[in-house]
Amino acid sequence: MGKLLYHKIYDSHVIHEDTNDDPILYIDRHLLHEVTSPQAFESIRFKNRKIRRPNKTFATMDHNVPTIMQNIHSIEGMSKIQLNQLTKNCKDFNITLFDLSHPHQGIIHVLAPEQGIILPGMTVVCGDSHTSTHGAFGALSFGIGTSEIEHVLVTQTLRQPKYKSMGINLFGTIPPYITAKDLILFIIGKIGHGGASGYIVEFYGDVINTLSMEERMTICNMSIEMGAASALIAPDVTTYNYLKNKKFSPNKTHWNQALLFWNTLHSDHDTNFDKIFNFDISNIKPQITWGTNPSQVISIDQPIPKLEIFTDPIERKSVIQALNYMKLTPNTYLTNISIDKVFIGSCTNSRIEDLRSAANIIKDHKISNNVHAIVVPGSKPVKKQAEKEGLDSIFIKAGFEWRLPGCSMCLGMNEDRLNAGERCASTSNRNFEGRQGRGGLTHLVSPAMAAAAAIAGHFVDIRTYF
């Protein structure tokens, strides 16, 4: 009997099993940022402990950093304290830090893949929910809490349960204007906000095979929004081509040896998932969320659902609460809804392909007078490449603000946020109440849809608007 990809990686990293507790896994990569790591380091100092493998630990500054000007001396309050503390912690414990002055600084889930830090078959952890992004490389990746961060820093291990397995097969032909963001929003809408709870999801099929690494990262990034513990995509030639010649990828001497191992990282034919979903994506339309979780999503040409279709009283109550918060009513078309802000960025959609997609829509247009729009590249290399291609000029000429790398408006933790009542077309991954700022109203869309909304001043169907 063969094994699933998930089981191959999991089993190969078990270093201790206990009948009364979850197995202990060895961790290959530990990613840090300024928000969830300070308490862990404080505890380590208090207990006079050492970092087990600083060479397998990588840190960046992303959540709290301003995106207008990135001078640490100009930052104030808790943000400055956390950034300074991260600098000290990394220096004291000899951890690689991509700080604000580093040419590779950026969002941790953008930076790590583009530097080749994440490789197929690895176990990866980070104190961030969207660590599942790295499953796009066939790496088993988990978001962890502060106490677990401390444990991994000190032991390079972590207890992890063995989750159930879910296979999601995508087949068909991707329609024009449809992006990876549309695919994953569609899937979340079908499976539900908690439909994958307790599962590791593997995405596979002909459609997955055609996607770029950046598109695969978008899909794995948002798998957490349907409750999955993490997500995986088996590595293939697309993966290998992406990783070749990256800073931390295997060098020429070790490349062929790495390929031999990576080529074993797939789910064997004679094994089964605990649950399987099959989706024909041939007729998917541009997706947009209307509520306060990513599963409350519709096609752009559909009205907001009527309350009658929600027969479960708990779900119905949740829908009513979401509609009240979002200031929307059932049976309304979102193409009739005006917006105030547009945010193109986040660890979901801030890579070069995302910016190209948005710029392709924006080119030779101006944004609406009533819209404030910003573009935030996911890393300095992304920003540099975009400027080399002239994308920054396209955005600036259209009326967008061209910002510096960071998490930015994805979460209301820095200077970029929504004011109460402001409605935003956002390429981020979460639309919970207050996620982008207290009282802010978030609609999740693809970069192309966000760009089109910026031009029109309201949501539009990009298939027919231009």
Curated annotation (Swiss-Prot):
InterPro entries to which the protein is assigned, alphabetical: 3-IsopropMal_deHydase_lsu, Acnase/IPM_dHydase_lsu_aba_1/3, Acoase/IPM_deHydtase_lsu_aba, Aconitase_4Fe-4S_BS, Aconitase_4Fe-4S_dom, IPM_dehydratase_rel_enz, IPMI_cat
An annotated Gene Ontology molecular function: metal ion binding
UniProt-listed Enzyme Commission number(s): 4.2.1.33
Cofactor(s) annotated in UniProt: [4Fe-4S] cluster
Catalyzed reactions per annotation: (2R,3S)-3-isopropylmalate = (2S)-2-isopropylmalate
Binding site for [4Fe-4S] cluster: C347, C407, C410
The protein's annotated pathway: Amino-acid biosynthesis; L-leucine biosynthesis; L-leucine from 3-methyl-2-oxobutanoate: step 2/4
Keyword Amino-acid biosynthesis attached: yes
GO terms of biological process kind: L-leucine biosynthetic process
Quaternary structure annotation from Swiss-Prot or TrEMBL: Heterodimer of LeuC and LeuD.
Name of protein: 3-isopropylmalate dehydratase large subunit
Biological classification of the source: Bacteria, Pseudomonadati, Pseudomonadota, Gammaproteobacteria, Enterobacterales
Gene: leuC
